[in-house]
Structures are given as structure tokens and as C-alpha cells.
């Protein structure tokens, strides 16, 4: 069922995920480099961003004591050097929604995958799969180069460092012995101004129409990396205007647009992204928490609170229908741990059976990637077919039938399917992006048949 004849463009966010597996010796050496009282004092202060090594050590120790996953932004670009000297990375893999989606689709061997990120240093370019193309302008003409050959010297690099820790590890902080109560991970995510400008660069922008002629669909993501203000006087509004121009260029070439939404903590920035981008696209991918975030911005606070608190399928369906109507795009795709959902209007040309098949392709592709760690060829998809649907499948179906009896859904097509869930996944990062990419790909395929 893989639509190998389709071509996809993906932008804007790609980064390196550098994995560090923490052991007792590494943790102890880190702590010993500082006065234990200073570490304790900094833990009390609870730094919300990392500016210097002591900030990192304090937040890491705090996370290890609790045994709960955490993420803290790194705001000092000079700290890159300290991290690279201090740690040996177990693995460097491609991260960022646009990067993950490009590599997944390239693994399926579809006709063409064009990836675009405004920053392409060599270290990042080398993590993309063979077959992924990058647009460049040479002698005034648009060309598509293998992405590994298109890197630019001096481009800024975004590295998210993921520190994995195991339950039971012990270390000392002064006189105190600490045992880690649970396994988990501590993420240090790069948040420098130099890598937060989400845009199509000036050399490529005039050629977006030409790129649009080469593809059937485009998947945009990464808006959550924007800042409200920049040191040169630009702001989020400037970059969102440019992003909207990109979308309109593709739409004029009849390219279907999917946006993979992501949580944005800053409420004002979230509102700007929702109101400036989502009404102009065809398809939006979100999870339950993001349904609530969008509803809150649209003024449906009570329903948003219900979704955050109770997590009921019925509320998510109602919220999804409201989002679809308020923002007036074509189809909403919701991915959660236990179910996937499409909500679209009744006049959508796809039947409910075709919509269900599209979602099934998405969850099967994600199950294959979770099982194998990567999609290296079209046959890898079949591995996902062997993964059973999750243990709550019957419960999901029952709740969906109840929701149908309570909600007025006559004007909509709503399809809910259970997910395939891998018990011991090799990989968990980016599975929502994988589902969205697979579902959007097959959605395009069914649309073409109509």
C-alpha cells in the first residue's frame, strides 16, 4: 500500500539528537568538579535555563533525585564546546520533526523527498538518508542536490543532548547518597537566537513555486522554535508572515499542505501560530494536549480544562470539531498513545473506510519504526503489521460508539482507530511525526484516486 510514486517537501526544523548514557562514574565526576554546597544552593534556586555548567549539574542532579524526565533549554551557545569536551556521545541521530519525517519517507523509497532547513552544517547534513534532496540555486537556476553535498560551512548547529539514566544508580552529593528511583531521560534543548529563525532563505524563496511543481504534498513544522523578539528588531510576526507566504506559494501550485503542530509554552506565540498558519493549510496533526492548547486560545477554556483533566475521547472529538470549524481547514489528524483520529467535514471525498486505512498505515509505520529504530526500506513497513493493536483497543471502540450516540456528528466524518503499540520499543522519539507522515502520505494517495 506504500504510495511510492508520490513526492513530498518537508521543512523547517532539523537538529542533532546526541545521546549520552549516564553511568555512576560520569555523574560523580560531574558533581566532584564543583563545591557540593554550591550545587545544592543552585538546585534550590532551580535555574529554568542553562547558562553555565553549574546550571546543568544542578538541574541534572534534581532530575536524578526525582527520577522523572525533564527538559531544560540551553541558551548560551558557547556551552556547546563544554558539552562536546565533557561527554562522549553514544549516538548522534537526526531529530526535529522535518528531519525525522524526511528520513522516514526516504526510507519508504517514495519518488522524491525534498527537505529544507534554513541551517545546514555538515554534521547535520550527514545524518540525512541517501536520496533526500535539498534545493540550491546555482547560476540563477534551481537545482536539487543530495543533501549531504549541499551543506554550508559556518551555519549554526542545533544539538539537543539527551541524557539517559537508569533506575538504581547511586552517587554522592556531599554527605548525601542518592539512588535514582526510576529510569528516564534529561533533555538539554538548544534555544539560541541563531537557530530560532524559522524561514526560507532569500536565495530559495523566489523558487518556491518551482519546488511546488515537483511535489504532491508539503509538511511544515518547527514554528514552536520561534522567539517573540530578536536582537535585530525582527519578531515572530515577521517570520510567521514569511511562513504564510511559503504556504500560499505551494497552494497556488495545488500542493496539499500538512502542518505538524507542537506544544508552545508561550501563550502569545501559540496564538500567533494558530491564527496565522493553521487557517491556510489543508491538514493539521496534533495530540490531545495540543487540542486543549488550541481550544484555550480560541476561547473554549472550559472544554480545554476538561480535556487536560479527564482526557475523555468524547471531549477530544468535540474539541476537534470546534477546531476544524473555527480554523476552517480540511482535515484534523489526532495521534495519542492508544488511538488515532481523523475529523473532517462530511463533503470530504474520502470514505470513512479510506480514512481508517490511512490512519492504519500511519500507526503501522510508527510500529515498524519503534520496533526497528529506523525505516531503511519499504519492506520494513511489514514489521509493523506484526505488532498487535494495544490492549485498550476494545475500550477505545466502546468509547467511540458512546461518543457517536451523544454528539451531533452529522456534518462530519469522524474516524477513530486503536494504535499498534510496541511493548519494548527500540526508539520512541518522533513516533507522532511518523504517524502523521504516513497518514498524510496515504491521505494524498486516496485523494488522487478520487
Curated annotation (Swiss-Prot):
Tell me, which GO biological process terms does this entry list?
fructose metabolic process; glycolytic process
Q: What class of enzyme is it?
A: transferase
The reaction(s) this protein catalyses: beta-D-fructose 6-phosphate + ADP = beta-D-fructose 1,6-bisphosphate + AMP + H(+)
Main localization (coarse): cytoplasm
Q: Which residues form a coiled coil?
A: none
Which pathway does it operate in? Carbohydrate degradation; glycolysis
- Family, per the entry? Belongs to the carbohydrate kinase PfkC family.
Q: Indicate what this protein is called per its UniProt record.
A: ADP-specific phosphofructokinase
